[in-house]
């Protein structure tokens, strides 16, 4: 299934993640999934949320740089080798994964 993801660009300093999450909480936006990637100076908070339009507005109002892009969601079998068998399908189809969420 295809969904829209929000990427929030953050300085890697204390309180920045909390400020972004707080901006969403104040608008009653549910975070369905998140991923954080960082370097020593900057990070990217990637989010799947309940209402992208409101989330983008709230984050921009809180002075964050944000982008929205399409991603796909795949249910992975909850068993040994479940992730591997799913990744094999992507490889067979020539689909490159840039990153992934997992739980």
Model-predicted segments: where are they?
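A conserved regulatory-domain signal marking ACT and ACT-like small-molecule sensing domains
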Residues: 1-103
